[in-house]
Amino acid sequence: ADLISPWADVKLDVQAMPFPSSQFDVVICNHVLEHVQSDIKAMGEIYRVLKPGGFAILQVPIDISREKTLEDPSINTPELREQYYLQRDHQRLYGRDYADRLRSVGFRVDENHFVDELPLNLVERYALPVGEVLFICNKPD
């Protein structure tokens, strides 16, 4: 699913998904939450559509030098967003508090560092960002 992509089989806004609650076993949301107006609302929607016992992988760009996510309504032009959030269409720049934001909607979060354990040739082959943490978010039973 995607809001814009012509290849998506379902067009949707992740902040208001047209699915019943407890519909999916797995949700993968890769570098989307930094683009939406309300990431907390989107996280809550993902939590809602997951079945109990299901999990989501929710990846975002993170500036690990930041303790807290930078999110300021006065950063509201493409130029300012690029300057502060590193991309013209981003709504925020996540910090080390990202997992806490996920927990705030009910997820149990596992910060998985598996990329660090892979041989460099596989990291390069699959274009994995070195040091990227996988945020595996479980919905309790």
Task: List where the protein language model places each region.
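Histidine- and/or cysteine-centered catalytic micro-motif in compact active-site loops
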Residues: 3-4, 32, 61-63
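A short SAM/SAH-binding and catalytic strip from SAM-dependent methyltransferases
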Residues: 25-37
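A short acidic, Gly/Pro-enriched loop at the edge of an enzyme's catalytic core
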Residues: 12-27
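Class I SAM-dependent methyltransferase SAM/SAH-binding core
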Residues: 1-16
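Conserved protein kinase catalytic core
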Residues: 8, 19, 65-67
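S-adenosyl-L-methionine-dependent methyltransferase catalytic module, highlighting the catalytic core
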Residues: 37-47, 51-141
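Short, flexible active-site loop motifs that bind/organize anionic cofactors or intermediates
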Residues: 14, 29-32, 89
